[in-house]
Amino acid sequence: MDAKTNDKSAGKCPFTSGRSHRIRDWWPGQLDVQVLHHNSNLSDPMDEDFDYAREFESLDLNAVIKDLTALMTDSQDWWPADFGHYGGLMIRLAWHSAGTYRITDGRGGAGAGQQRFAPLNSWPDNVLLDRGRRLLWPIKQKYGRKISWADLLVLSGNVALESMGFKTFGFAGGRADVWEPEELYWGPEGTWLGDERYSGERQLAEPLAAVQMGLIYVNPEGPNGKPDPIAAATDIRETFFRMAMNDEETVALIAGGHTFGKTHGAGDASLVGPAPESAPIEDQGLGWNSKFGTGKGGDSIGSGLEVTWTQTPTTWDNNFFDTLFKYEWELTKSPAGAYQWQAKDAPAITPDAHDTSKKHVPTMLTTDLSLRFDPAYGKISKHFHENPDQFADAFARAWYKLTHRDMGPRERYLGPLVPKETLIWQDPIPAVDHALVDDKDIAELKAKVLASGLTVPQLVSTAWASASTFRGSDKRGGANGARIRLAPQKDWEVNQPAQLKTVLARLEAIQSEFNGAQTGGKKVSLADLIVLAGCFAVEKAANDVGIDLKVPFTPGRMDASQDQTDVDSFAPLEPRADGFRNYIGSRHQFMTPEEALVDRAQLLNLTGPEMTVLVGGLRVLGANAADSRHGVFTKQPGTLTNDFFANLLTMDTVWQPVAGQDDVYEGRDRKTNAVQWTGTRVDLIFGSHSQLRAFAEVYACTDAKEKFARDFVAAWTKVMNADRFDLHR
């Protein structure tokens, strides 16, 4: 809502500000592996046995809601409430906490309280939201560890809506805080509000969703500040689609959110000070301090826009649509010089936020007019205008989706306000309704799987394909549900559909035979059997080279149906690249292969050593896509050896690019010049990158064969269980 600010929010250039240079300042093209080690327990101030879910479940949520409700109308002199109510501010606070979510990679969102940290706390679009967090601090301080900042930010938005007469759909807790900023890719730009993310005919680069650096969604003045409602609608549609919202949800969210509060552009934006991260130390993390008038209340400057959408900005009603359709609109500028629109030939009927004796002519943003003048949005807006109950329901559901989209499956939701209805975007999976297999059953299934004719590479690659869709960002994907047998996953190129069909058919036959022979309701799900078969294959691969180990397995997965699977919603989970399988798809664009490997490892919540041992193990086990031989640095494929590392690091091999093949290399014997191996950038990075080479050296040592196998099994099990929220919350 408030989006525009000046350049004072930017920090100083690292090369001219007198500080020492980091390694990546000297070698900016160096692969960044440190992203795999962020938010470790070394930065966590909580006790080792701290369990946020347990703490939240002991919270008196009604007491928190009561305190939040009281806060809404307890205007503070240091930051007076607009219209005597902080509701508009708290809605924007919650919205912008959740609104960074993007469906392409599941990153962003409200799930970790990242709005407290740079860069989000100092984004132009988050101007003055630091005031909202400071208003919440006494409540956070009161309830301490029982409610996270992440949960409190979302809850404050819900309570704000409820306190102004709106009935929300529900609220779930369970968002545990993190303690350091995430190093996410927010765009290529080096300046606030830059838009180098576009190419061609306004093609927005992936995985981005927002239109400019430092914005949550779109520029409220219009594309690049040009006040064109139709062009703005194009940006809105693309951006909200990339945040998993359709047209109806988009209209409901914008109109619902703009039913309350106002924007702030009372005067010259050049009088506004720097953002929190570059504010003077004595300002104690409060940014955007203004020298215009009092700098607060009626003198507030945020986005530079000065718009109050309705005549009842602290009440839920249909006034937004009433105003939008009642008047014709003419272009004007705010006192801060930002483009906005005012009602033509309209009386001054909109209240002032801080002076009850003043009234204003109705105003709107360029992006508000998009909801009327874009044909598709206009049709939806008229329907909502004529059917306010349907508008209220649509906004309630869209707000719930916005604020909970990155929480993952419903089983992670905590608290008494979780709605009973299960929604398709929650990727539902049936609850376990049968007795689970025991050790004796597992032994029987192992014998059947190993006698089925399926190979170690087939079983390993199928289990990996099923489990490795998991994204720690929004807790989606994973082996639970066995969605690898359903559209769209069964048809993904990386999953080798023809081979996958064969493997699944044989596993389904084993499942059917086993379940048909049971009494007492015992069953094995296909989801469990896929993982179990992969575990059997890993055990066999280790045993075949004399390493005796057992791969842990815990039953309890269930099989989802096609009706429980939104094909369009699952499409973004398709890997454009998967370095673990040495796969680069035709649509892969925005990263090098080795960057894509680290990116996928980060989504799987893997550390650098875990990523390293998994790549080395999956190569020798033959799990490459399309049965590629790249990176299979072993003479005994299908066995769990440390050959990948030993053969990569030897000085007996010389590597050189293969002519005509992008990112493919051949390793030749240094003496005979005979080709020994072929590999990709993903393979060779473990010998080239100094930190990854250090990890690889550990596993290449002669005495590391068993350690390699044990570490591989541990990392494998972590991925297989990544979505088992019944085992870890």
Swiss-Prot record:
For this chain, the Swiss-Prot or TrEMBL PTM comment says: Formation of the three residue Trp-Tyr-Met cross-link is important for the catalase, but not the peroxidase activity of the enzyme.
Q: Which organism is it from?
A: Nitrobacter hamburgensis (strain DSM 10229 / NCIMB 13809 / X14)
**According to its UniProt record, which cofactors does this protein need?**
heme b
State the name under which the record lists this protein: Catalase-peroxidase
Q: Where is heme b annotated to bind?
A: H258
- The catalytic activity of this protein is classed by the Enzyme Commission as 1.11.1.21
Subunit-level organization: Homodimer or homotetramer.
Underlying gene = katG
> So what does this thing catalyse?
H2O2 + AH2 = A + 2 H2O; 2 H2O2 = O2 + 2 H2O
Listed PROSITE patterns: PEROXIDASE_1 (PS00435), PEROXIDASE_2 (PS00436), PEROXIDASE_4 (PS50873)
